[in-house]
């Protein structure tokens, strides 16, 4: 069945009178998108219910929690571990600033793990209170479709109950994938990596995406020997190639061993740990093997076919520009739709859904100039187009401005690690198409750049802006020398 793409005037605005249904809206999944969609819909007067699995730090078919992947087993606990890992470098840098650190500095993994768990338990409660204060009915259990207006919730005790709703919103997120190789059961995913009882001394990571790079930085900062394997020449496929090179250099500079163009072929248990065999015949012994090879939409147990909801070849729910599925009253937001899989994007999609369905304001999510960050050490952050993307879209030449410098702090600490910044500009309009930064505080700085790009800032706007001195951020408004001018007809290497 082909999806009908809605026009603005065709978007039905819900009448929140309940009608013959139990609820105006039933939401499956209380992650970032589900919670936002629930409470904003309730603020428009809708009668809303939401179902979610019982809380647990590690997800499964029967375990979840309010806040979803980001809060419980993703962005938040990961960032806490990044903070914890960063102190090793700070202690090293402190010496040349006059700090005399005598004796051993011991790291207590169990204490950090305990405090991390306490924080996500707290946040799980915060999300429940937000829903309760918004008037949303919370139901514990796993939801699945019976038909276009009925959801069946399987409770933790195995009992089942059905609820009807005029509209259904699916916001079940995604789950980590495992590579199908012999011994795969010996590996862990990011879920387990955030809750390990013991900190590994020897870690092998398979994958070149942001999760792989972040855990490589985390474990190395905590003292582990880390080997990172990935299929391409550089990690972070999809990011700007020049910035990918910078990240790879920084990882190696921090002591992480990179294995580009290499895959794992087999894992086996030995007396000394896990034996890892690569497709090049190399063998390594590790305490932990992490599969960081991507995530897949959480749609398998929703019984979507019962209502006629279409999915693509990886199980992502197909939606139109308003997040409506192939069934007119069923909607989906967040990772389960596999659009831009970021928490703030799920929040945006859910807000647009509520405005469209219950607010009388048909609103499409705007995916232009969405910023993102990789919390490696140091971090990478970007907004807008990479140089390669700009060349694919440009009708005129692309102007590239770059700055590579030693931050003031490194001048004293003697750390050999440069900060790199980049602006991509349309030569015809002078509009800044993209901004990238790899270095300390990059995500904090790029968030401000995102506002500038969203407002249509030109290079002249940047040049006329007064900087804050001394700061790294001022480099973005002092890059006046053109690094290179690139024609769209050129063919940059894109399969790195």
UniProtKB/Swiss-Prot annotation:
Keyword Transferase: no
Reactions accelerated catalytically: 2 glutathione + NADP(+) = glutathione disulfide + NADPH + H(+)
Cofactor binding note: Binds 1 FAD per subunit.
Cofactor requirement: FAD
One Gene Ontology term, aspect cellular component: cytoplasm
EC number in record: 1.8.1.7
Location within or outside the cell: Cytoplasm
Main location: cytoplasm
Transmembrane segments annotated in the record for this chain: none
Binding site for FAD: 32-33, 52, 69-70, 78, 143, 335, 343, 469
UniProt-annotated binding residues for NADP(+): 208, 211, 214, 231, 237, 294, 373
GO molecular function: flavin adenine dinucleotide binding; glutathione-disulfide reductase (NADPH) activity; NADP binding; thioredoxin-disulfide reductase (NADPH) activity
UniProt-annotated catalytic positions: 469
Disulfide bonds: 70-75
Source taxon at top rank: Eukaryota
Key words of the record: Cytoplasm, Disulfide bond, FAD, Flavoprotein, NADP, Oxidoreductase, Redox-active center
Enzyme class: oxidoreductase
Residues binding glutathione: 32, 127
GO biological process, one term: glutathione metabolic process
Tagged with keyword Cytoplasm: yes
SUPFAM superfamilies: FAD/NAD(P)-binding domain, FAD/NAD-linked reductases, dimerisation (C-terminal) domain
Other remarks in the entry: The active site is a redox-active disulfide bond.
Oligomeric and partner information: Homodimer.
Family membership noted in the UniProt record: Belongs to the class-I pyridine nucleotide-disulfide oxidoreductase family.
Its biological purpose: Catalyzes the reduction of glutathione disulfide (GSSG) to reduced glutathione (GSH). Constitutes the major mechanism to maintain a high GSH:GSSG ratio in the cytosol.
Record's protein name: Glutathione reductase, cytosolic
Organism: Oryza sativa subsp. japonica
